[in-house]
A protein has these predicted regions:
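Active-site-proximal, substrate-binding regions of enzyme catalytic domains
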Residues: 3-118, 124-155
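Positively charged, low-complexity/disordered segments
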Residues: 157-160
């Protein structure tokens, strides 16, 4: 069964090519992740470099179709930016303006639509919260990274 991987900001900042590494599955970038990436673009560190690389990569893919409908990837998967699920119920005590909670809200909304949703994040607290609201969750690590990406440095300095 095809999986739907929702990718957290920290995964893209860690490895901008991560969005290409989920084989023939769907990859979702919640709109709040784009907002968070945008906040890193002027950073002079590796995080800033990776945010800029990710922006160029997503922009390059955007030219192949509509991100809100999904863009076919070379590996058979599909990339999509998700802007919906603002009305999906979350625990009343959770601040819906907090980025992590918005990401979880997107995951929950997609799950309620029948998708096999997996949140991929390097954030341990987000993994704990995902588990608390019954969202499948995994850390991003080597099993997702294609062979060609394993030898690259974490800072990506070349153009897409």
């Amino acid at each position: 069964m095809k999986k739907t991987y929702v990718v957290d900001t920290n995964v893209i900042l860690y490895s901008p090519n991560a969005i290409l590494s989920f084989e023939e599955n769907d990859v979702i970038i919640p709109e709040v992740v784009l907002e968070e990436l945008d906040s890193f673009k002027k950073d002079k560190s590796d995080l800033g470099a990776n945010a800029r690389y990710a922006a160029r990569l997503i922009d390059k893919l955007r030219k192949q179709g509509k991100l809100n409908e999904g863009i076919d990837l070379e590996n058979g998967g599909k990339l999509r930016v998700e802007m919906n699920h603002h009305d999906t119920q979350m625990p009343a005590s959770w601040n819906k303006e907090k980025a992590d909670n918005r990401i979880l809200q997107v995951c929950k909304g997609l799950k309620e639509q029948g998708e096999d949703v997996w949140l991929i994040t390097k954030d341990i607290f987000l993994r704990i919260k995902a588990d608390a609201v019954d969202i499948n969750v995994e850390d991003y690590y080597e099993k997702f990274v294609p062979e060609y990406d394993r030898s690259e440095e974490r800072r990506v300095g070349k153009e897409c």
